[in-house]
Amino acid sequence: KIFINISGYSIDEIQKRFGNLNKNKVILMYGYQNFPTDLGKTRFKIFNKWRKKNFLLGYADHSEAEDTSLTYLGSSIAIQNGATYIEKHITLDRKKKLPDYVSSFEEFEFKNFIKYFKNFFNMLDNDVISNDEKIYKNEMGKDY
């Protein structure tokens, strides 16, 4: 697979430059390129246009790592708009201020991020009534 960052390009520029590539092997990565990312300026709605052109999509997250809610929010919105890949930087020690440190998760934060998205995907993909729900329904006398 080839990952191409398309941040800052219009849909016409992307189509002109990458329209002839094998869409099953190219992932268009989008993320508002500023450190840290201002989620209010991120154009998540544009994912729908790219998806209609059958491109695989990814989200390059550069939100402030110390505010994990921003990363979770941005990545969740991207996934719900068609992103199947998430780029998130990791670092062993953010205090060393290496490149991209502002948006880099430390190990424990990254583990929590993975755990969150395992649950997130389970919630999105699950449409079966669980045994727990059936038991609750019966115990509460819900028989409409």
Identify the residue ranges that each predicted region occupies:
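Catalytic cores and adjacent flexible loops of soluble metabolic enzymes
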Residues: 1-144
